[in-house]
Amino acid sequence: LTTGSLAGFRGAEEIDRDRVLEIETDILYPAALENSINDKNADRIKAGIISELANGPTTPNADLILFEKGVKVIPDILASSGGVIVSYFEMVQDSSSFFWDEEGVNRGLDLKISKGFRSVFNALEENRIHSRLAAMVVGVARVAEACKIRGWV
């Protein structure tokens, strides 16, 4: 890139930025702005799956619209949780002075992400709710269990 932009790239079709989210695609990865999927454009989303890489890219009203349309959403708190998980691994390693190799970190990350996804998917199926609400249900249940184990409640 010599122009600093993709605009005018030879052989590419230029698309209005407001229509990018409405392109027909299997998976949509909103990765930049909060509230970019909202009640004004959610009904025009053509993706079958949305994996939220940005923080809060979908508004609550859009969540409901997408759920009613049958669009599968992997909410931001699940899709972008890898960094937080690995930060936790770093804290655990530092506190115990026992350090893992890259393979061990990746294996642990895979286990945590897979378990989280299964938990959210199960909550979604059992309660017939949208995925963000399912993720919140799982999260609140885990915090409640941790508080109970610690004798706080």
Language model: regions and residue ranges:
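A structured beta-alpha segment of the ubiquitous adenosine-cofactor-binding alpha/beta core
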Residues: 1-41
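Adenosine-phosphate binding glycine-rich loop
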Residues: 43-153
